[in-house]
Amino acid sequence: MRDADADAGGGADGGDGRGGHSCRGGVDTAAAPAGGAPPAHAPGPGRDAASAARGSRMRPHIFTLSVPFPTPLEAEIAHGSLAPDAEPHQRVVGKDLTVSGRILVVRWKAEDCRLLRISVINFLDQLSLVVRTMQRFGPPVSR
């Protein structure tokens, strides 16, 4: 399994390994102080408030999963079983399934790391069901 954000030290769970409510590279939510007002955010070094606001666009979170199968035929069967499942949040989470030899490759792209995490978890549940079903019925017969 390979996470593109892991190269920079973060992941889909919030980036800092704590599994908190913030997304690395995304919008962090901060708790309001006792007075009730949210904390003010100062622009970074050499930036004024206007350029900080323009530069606050989030980079998309990208997650790629490579699933090896014993044979290319089994990878194709899994692809055929999993590809028809539409993504519930199609506007904010993109999911692309491809097969390369005996490897099923799934690539997600999302603006919101929480929706990305939900999509990956749901996919892993479906993948688990497909793999267990394939194991129960035995190796496929060549077409």
Curated annotation (Swiss-Prot):
Region annotated Disordered, chain positions: 1-57
Superkingdom of origin: Eukaryota
UniProt KW keywords: Cytoplasm, Disease variant, Epilepsy, Intellectual disability, Nucleus, tRNA processing
Biased composition range(s): Low complexity: 30-55
One GO term describing the cellular component: nucleoplasm
Subcellular location: Cytoplasm; Nucleus
Matching InterPro entries: CTAG/Pcc1
Tissue: Ubiquitous.
GO annotation (BP), single: tRNA processing
Subunit structure: Component of the EKC/KEOPS complex composed of at least GON7, TP53RK, TPRKB, OSGEP and LAGE3; the whole complex dimerizes.
Disease note: Galloway-Mowat syndrome 2, X-linked: A form of Galloway-Mowat syndrome, a severe renal-neurological disease characterized by early-onset nephrotic syndrome associated with microcephaly, central nervous system abnormalities, developmental delays, and a propensity for seizures. Brain anomalies include gyration defects ranging from lissencephaly to pachygyria and polymicrogyria, and cerebellar hypoplasia. Most patients show facial dysmorphism characterized by a small, narrow forehead, large/floppy ears, deep-set eyes, hypertelorism and micrognathia.
Function: Component of the EKC/KEOPS complex that is required for the formation of a threonylcarbamoyl group on adenosine at position 37 (t(6)A37) in tRNAs that read codons beginning with adenine. The complex is probably involved in the transfer of the threonylcarbamoyl moiety of threonylcarbamoyl-AMP (TC-AMP) to the N6 group of A37. LAGE3 functions as a dimerization module for the complex.
Protein family according to the UniProt entry: Belongs to the CTAG/PCC1 family.
Protein name, per record: EKC/KEOPS complex subunit LAGE3
Source organism: Homo sapiens
Highest classification ranks of the organism: Eukaryota, Metazoa, Chordata, Craniata, Vertebrata
